[in-house]
């Protein structure tokens, strides 16, 4: 008996839009268990990737790494080293490295992925992901010119609107570090408009709100910064739930409130 992946993805989309983070995690764990019981390797890989990605967003990288270890062997056995499936998995593992602050490992993985994709055809979507993720690692290492170059390369080849929105958030974060706040705000507002227009309550929307909040904070517009941090926390709480990223958002919100109080006293 084969696992119904089409039904899984439909249910997962509903969970992301209508359920809280705990319910989504339980759903993913239950479905992953079903794929293992059915011994459906294709489904184990697909659902395992979604579960590991969700754990990564929650900051639970140790658990995510364990799942990636399981599915990496299955991917190599099923598709081989020079394959889009393996390249896609390496990109996901690199995301986990970035969350775990293993930036050099992430860059090495993504360079390897780029080499694999150069030997395959029809790889624009995956190559854009390489650029996006490597840009994040470069940004974390303060290699801002390389980070901006990668993200701009991604935007040149992406056609999917949602992926464009993600790339614009990433570009905005680089521009913030370069203190180009006006340009950063244009990029992140484009992303926010896309998510709100399409009623997509996703973790990426929380990231967009937090990025906007950071821009307003740097511009000393503390009330607006607070507004966007609160929106970011609401969306993150709905879609992911508790975790270190939410803790950081709350810390940033409190810092913005403190700075607003100080500004009122001056």
Give the role of each language-model region:
Residues 6-38, 50-57, 99:
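Alpha-helical segment of the N-proximal tetratricopeptide repeat
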Residues 13-17, 46-57, 84-99, 125-140, ...:
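Conserved alpha-helical positions within TPR/SEL1-like repeat arrays
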Residues 27, 67, 147-151, 183-191, ...:
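Alpha-helical repeat scaffolds
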Residues 29-34, 69-77, 111-119, 152-157, ...:
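Amphipathic alpha-helical segments of tetratricopeptide repeats
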Residues 37-40, 77-81, 119-122, 156-161, ...:
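Short coil/turn linkers that connect adjacent helices within long alpha-helical scaffolds
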Residues 236, 241-266:
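Terminal, low-structured helical/coil segments at or just beyond the last alpha-helical repeat
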């Amino acid at each position: 008996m084969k696992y119904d992946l089409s039904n899984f993805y439909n249910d997962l989309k509903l969970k992301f839009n209508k359920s809280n983070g705990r319910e989504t995690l339980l759903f993913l764990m239950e479905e992953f268990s079903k794929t293992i019981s059915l011994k459906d390797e294709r489904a184990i890989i697909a659902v395992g990737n979604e579960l590991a990605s969700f754990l990564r967003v929650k900051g639970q990288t140790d658990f995510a790494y364990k799942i990636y270890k399981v599915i990496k062997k299955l991917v190599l056995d099923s598709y081989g080293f020079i394959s889009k499936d393996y390249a896609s998995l390496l990109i996901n593992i690199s995301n986990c490295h970035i969350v775990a602050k293993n930036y050099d490992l992430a860059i090495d993985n993504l360079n390897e992925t780029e080499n694999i994709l150069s030997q395959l055809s029809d790889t624009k979507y995956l190559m854009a992901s390489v650029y996006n993720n490597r840009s994040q690692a470069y940004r974390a290492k303060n290699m801002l010119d390389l980070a901006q170059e990668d993200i701009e390369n991604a935007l040149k080849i992406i056609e999917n609107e949602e992926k464009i929105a993600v790339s614009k958030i990433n570009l905005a974060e680089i521009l913030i570090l370069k203190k180009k706040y006006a340009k950063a705000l244009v990029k992140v507002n484009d992303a926010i408009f896309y998510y709100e227009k399409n009623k997509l309550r996703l973790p990426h929307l929380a990231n967009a709100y937090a990025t906007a909040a950071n821009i307003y904070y740097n511009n000393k517009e503390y009330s607006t910064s607070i507004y966007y941090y609160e929106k970011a926390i609401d969306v993150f709480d709905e879609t992911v739930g508790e975790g270190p990223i939410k803790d950081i958002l709350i810390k940033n919100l409190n810092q913005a409130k403190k700075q607003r109080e100080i500004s009122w006293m001056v």
